[in-house]
């Protein structure tokens, strides 16, 4: 009775207050009326080494082109084997020569020979740029850095030192001293940084204090404070890893994107075997976004990263085809030569899951992880289409299913939202695969298509592997503004409502180093020192942190809002998005909900608002509480807002 009286009062109240709000809405939620179970792997992240996401980004290596393998077959003017290095940095006299004879190993064929004629000659690595405007490496006082370098000498007399210093030679760390021997040897040490306040970026500087010839290869500098320092690749940047973890990702899709495929020439295929084993033996390759991949963040490290951030691994392998979006490229692997590649794919699964008595399982154990990784899915192909793709997909996925029947293979549905022709092939031939959809659309497309999955047959599971709301570019870059994030939020209400058919989804791309980006928008921006979280990031985080176990009945009347209601055993989540610029008075009518307090997490602001390095908290979620009484919660949603109410059910 009390509830009925409240409702009558409420309706009267809404009537009298109508002039104050452009919108009013009543959302009736029946927590006891379950519609379907929700996918427990719905939200994840998609990592690709685009925008220097890996090298110069998540990968903890601070030196750029540490092993002189940098080259770009497509654009030789852009990079060369000396990229990132400066020679004749200080005094002394010497010559340098790029060498290939008797290298460190066959996979790491280039090194630099220093022929020093006057002691004091210096060479320096400038890192990836301490900021968007200056070169150098950002090092911090009081921090320790792990360093190593491979050296060899036949006739050198004297020592080689390594230290951090500025461009003028002011020391920023202690000095490590090595006496190179006749064989390639790895020399290691710790550098403790002491950087005066407000000074410039540092360089890692080698000083040749003797004369003669020294060969140098594979130098490395990583902050001791990183995650994964025992991984053979060396580990990942702590702040970025923590930002990923805070998204509560259920899975990690890697290593691309187009990167997983490679472009133009078959030697550019992403070969997972090149990315495992001792780090100095990994065979580098340039990536499709124009720079070199050191592979220090390789497949082993990706699997470890998954464990670190609490995500399940979702590797993508190419389907014997280079990135089809790029034209004028080498032909795919012929069908009658596919066997060797199929074996590579099976070897990858063995690497992840095989016993330590198998060849690849043994390598995994040797690298530090005897236990298998929890590999459940394998995507074969990225953005592919046509018979040329499906024929190869069929062969590879059949082989996988035969050897590992519990692994779900994922088939690509091409690069566009209008993918019905791909779906008709898939439904007729590969209905038991999961289907990877990709689409980047104007922001307004997303709310307009919130019902996209309502009509999808429930027989085949969808993986929305890449999506993002695109705004018009400003100065060449599409902004990560609040409006785009809210359009994604509106769309996610539709995804959640259809999470019986959409099993997984992830925003793309994930990371971008400021000033070194090739693609916008991106979920997380960073520079040498800081991490910038976008409004789009916060939406992903808010939705992922409040993943229900089932979708419950909800019905909206009144103003146009986007909404979904889900629940766990003891909590009801109501997600509401207001895409209009006007506030809306919202009434939640809730059954089976005790009196108490709901917590509210809300992202709102100016539609064009963005976060920037100068003002990183312009758009951040705020937490508040709202009373729930007699099954009613009333609130005023601001214009341009996404709100998530977490309402205790007991
Ligand atoms: O996410 C950026 C790129 O977009 C991916 O590499 C590719 O799959 C898509 O075209």
Name each model feature, range by range.
Residues 191-196, 201-203, 232-249, 295-309, ...:
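An active-site-proximal structural segment forming one wall of the substrate-binding cleft
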Residues 560-595, 600-605, 640-646:
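Carbohydrate-binding surface patches
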Residues 594-633, 637:
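Acidic, Ser/Thr/Pro-rich beta/coil linker or hinge segments at domain junctions
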Residues 45, 149, 248, 306, ...:
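Conserved, mostly hydrophobic/aromatic
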Residues 8-16:
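Bacterial N-terminal signal peptides
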Residues 398-401, 405-408, 426-427, 434-546, ...:
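Catalytic-core region of carbohydrate-active enzymes that cleave or remodel glycosidic bonds
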Residues 23-294, 312, 327-339, 382, ...:
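Extracellular and organelle-lumenal recognition/adhesion modules and their flexible linkers in secreted
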Residues 255-258, 319-320, 324, 354-388, ...:
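Active-site groove signature of glycoside hydrolases
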């Amino acid at each position: 009775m009390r509830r009925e009286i409240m409702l009558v009062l409420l309706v009267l109240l809404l009537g009298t207050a109508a002039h104050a709000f452009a919108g009013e809405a009543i959302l009736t939620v029946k927590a006891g009326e379950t519609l379907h179970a929700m996918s427990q792997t719905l939200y994840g992240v998609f990592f690709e080494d685009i925008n220097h996401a890996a090298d110069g980004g998540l990968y903890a290596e601070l030196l750029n082109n540490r092993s002189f393998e940098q080259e770009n077959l497509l654009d030789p003017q852009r990079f060369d084997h000396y990229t990132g290095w400066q020679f004749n940095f200080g005094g002394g006299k010497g010559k340098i020569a790029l060498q290939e004879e008797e290298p460190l190993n066959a996979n790491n064929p280039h090194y630099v020979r220093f022929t020093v004629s006057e002691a004091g000659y210096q060479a320096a690595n400038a890192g990836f740029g301490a900021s968007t405007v200056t070169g150098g490496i950002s090092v911090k006082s009081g921090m320790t850095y792990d360093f190593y370098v491979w050296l060899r000498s036949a006739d050198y007399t004297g020592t080689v030192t390594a230290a951090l210093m500025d461009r003028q030679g002011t020391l920023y760390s202690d000095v490590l001293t090595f006496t190179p021997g006749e064989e390639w040897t790895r020399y290691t040490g710790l550098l403790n940084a002491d950087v005066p306040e407000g000074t410039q970026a540092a360089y890692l500087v080698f000083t040749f204090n003797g004369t003669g010839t020294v060969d140098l290869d594979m130098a490395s500098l990583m902050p001791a404070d990183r995650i994964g320092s025992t991984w053979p690749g060396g580990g990942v940047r702590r702040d970025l890893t923590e930002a990923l973890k805070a998204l509560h990702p259920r899975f990690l899709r890697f290593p691309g994107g187009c990167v997983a495929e490679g472009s133009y020439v078959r030697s550019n295929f992403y070969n997972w075997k090149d990315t495992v084993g001792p780090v100095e033996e990994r065979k580098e390759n340039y990536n499709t976004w124009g720079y070199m991949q050191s592979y220090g963040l390789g497949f082993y490290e990706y699997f470890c990263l998954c464990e670190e951030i609490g995500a399940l691994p979702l590797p993508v392998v190419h389907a014997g085809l280079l990135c089809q979006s790029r034209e004028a490229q080498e032909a795919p692997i012929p069908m009658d030569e596919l066997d060797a590649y199929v074996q590579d794919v099976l070897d990858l699964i063995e690497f992840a899951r095989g016993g330590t008595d198998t060849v690849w399982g043994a390598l995994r154990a040797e690298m530090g992880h005897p236990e298998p990784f929890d590999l459940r899915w394998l995507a074969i192909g990225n953005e592919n289409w046509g018979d040329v793709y499906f024929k190869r997909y069929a062969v590879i996925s059949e082989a996988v299913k035969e050897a590992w029947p519990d692994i779900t293979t994922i088939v690509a549905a091409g690069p566009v939202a209008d993918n019905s022709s791909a779906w008709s092939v898939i439904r007729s031939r590969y209905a038991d695969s999961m289907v990877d959809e990709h689409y980047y659309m104007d922001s307004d497309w997303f709310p307009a298509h919130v019902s996209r999955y309502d009509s999808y047959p429930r027989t085949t599971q969808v993986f929305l592997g890449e999506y993002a709301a695109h705004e018009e570019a400003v100065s060449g870059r599409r902004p990560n503004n609040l409006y785009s994030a809210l359009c994604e939020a509106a769309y996610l209400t539709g995804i959640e409502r259809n999470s019986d058919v959409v099993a997984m989804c992830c925003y793309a791309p994930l990371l971008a180093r400021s000033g070194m980006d090739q693609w916008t928008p991106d979920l997380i921006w960073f520079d040498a020192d800081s991490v910038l979280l976008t409004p789009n990031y916060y939406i992903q985080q808010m939705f992922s942190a409040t993943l229900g176990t089932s979708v419950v009945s909800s019905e909206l009347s009144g103003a146009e809002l986007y909404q979904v209601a889900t629940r766990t055993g003891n909590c009801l989540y109501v997600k509401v998005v207001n895409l209009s610029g006007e506030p809306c008075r919202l009434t939640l009518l809730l059954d089976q909900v005790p009196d108490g307090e709901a917590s509210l997490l809300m992202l709102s602001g100016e539609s064009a608002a963005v976060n920037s390095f100068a003002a990183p908290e312009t758009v951040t979620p705020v937490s508040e509480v709202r009373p729930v009484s007699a099954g009613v919660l009333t609130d005023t949603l601001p214009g341009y807002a996404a709100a998530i109410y977490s309402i205790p059910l007991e």
